[in-house]
């Protein structure tokens, strides 16, 4: 999703409630805050790294680190998080801006992270099983 797409989505989520800020610096600050919340709660595949020179937010699963997402510079830039988590970012921003539906947006965002994390854990488990099977077939002497 592009930054412009995110702004359009947040605008739609706030219909009849509030509007997004006209000042793009304010919108990017809200996005930065939403990204921070997501990076601290979600096992975002796109944010997982083993490169400790990047700005790290926390430890991830296994040997992975979770890096800080980069903010977009232009409206046409793709958001630096997994596609499914873009909708979570929109909900968190809508919660920050909403006058009447704060809890609804927050709950939808939190639910999106729970569903996303469930999928990621299934993927990581499958990868570990496949690594183990590959190692057994090739006669690895290491753990994998």
Give the residues covered by each predicted segment.
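Short secondary-structure subsegments characteristic of cysteine-rich extracellular domains
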Residues: 108-124
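Elongated alpha-helical scaffolds
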Residues: 83-96
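Conserved short "hinge" loops at termini or chain/domain junctions
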Residues: 1-78, 119-144
